[in-house]
C-alpha cells in the first residue's frame, strides 16, 4: 500500500529507518519504467541493494501504474510511499546516505548538499554533477546499479560541494554580458 502525502508524517522512525542509514529512490522516466524487462531489471538491483540498506521509494504516479501493470514486487526492506511535498522530500533526500534516481533535478540538488547520488540512466544532461559533484552515472543494468551503489558508499562524508557558476550570481553575469554587447 502506498501512503499518500496527507497521511504520511515524514518521520523516518515510522519507516523503521535511521537518519543517514537509508537510501532514497525515485524512478519516473519512461525509458526506465515503461518497459517491463528493463523496469524489472532495475527493481532486481534495488531489491538486492535493500539487503544492505533500507530503501525509501517515493513513487511517481506513472511508476505506480507500471508497478501494478507489470506485477512488480519489492523486498520487505523497500518502503513505498506516495509523492510528498517538496520541502518534506528535500528532508528525505538530505538525510539519506545515498539517493538512487533517474531525475535530472535531484542530481543537482544532491550535489549542492553533498549527498551521494547514483543516477539510473545511460546519460545525464548535468555532467558537472559527475565531474565535480557527488553523482555517479550508473546506467540501467542491474550489475552496474549495484556497483555504483557500493562505490557511492565509499564516498567521503557529506559536505557542501561548491560548483563554479552555482553561486547565485547568474543575473549579475548576464548583465555584464549585456553591457558588453
Residue map of PLM features:
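Leloir-type glycosyltransferase catalytic cores
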Residues: 1-8, 136-181
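A conserved nucleotide-sugar
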Residues: 18, 43-59
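A short acidic/histidine/glycine-rich donor-binding loop in glycosyltransferase catalytic cores
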Residues: 118, 133-138
Amino acid at each position: 500500500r502506498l501512503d499518500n502525502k496527507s497521511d504520511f508524517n515524514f518521520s523516518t522512525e515510522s519507516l523503521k529507518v535511521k537518519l543517514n542509514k537509508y537510501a532514497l529512490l525515485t524512478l519516473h522516466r519512461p525509458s526506465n519504467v515503461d518497459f517491463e524487462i528493463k523496469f524489472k531489471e532495475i527493481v532486481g538491483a534495488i531489491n538486492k541493494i535493500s539487503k544492505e540498506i533500507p530503501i525509501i521509494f517515493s513513487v511517481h504516479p506513472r511508476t505506480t501504474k507500471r508497478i501494478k501493470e507489470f506485477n512488480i514486487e519489492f523486498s520487505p526492506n523497500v518502503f513505498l510511499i506516495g509523492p510528498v511535498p517538496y520541502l518534506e522530500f528535500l528532508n528525505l533526500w538530505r538525510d539519506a546516505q545515498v539517493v538512487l534516481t533517474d531525475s535530472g533535478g535531484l542530481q543537482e540538488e544532491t550535489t549542492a548538499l553533498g549527498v551521494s547520488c547514483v543516477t539510473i540512466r545511460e546519460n545525464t544532461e548535468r555532467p558537472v554533477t559527475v565531474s565535480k559533484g557527488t553523482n555517479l552515472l550508473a546506467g540501467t543494468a542491474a550489475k552496474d546499479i549495484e556497483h555504483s551503489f557500493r562505490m557511492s558508499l565509499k564516498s567521503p562524508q557529506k559536505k557542501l560541494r561548491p560548483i563554479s557558476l552555482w553561486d547565485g550570481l547568474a543575473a549579475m553575469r548576464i548583465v555584464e554580458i549585456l553591457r558588453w554587447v
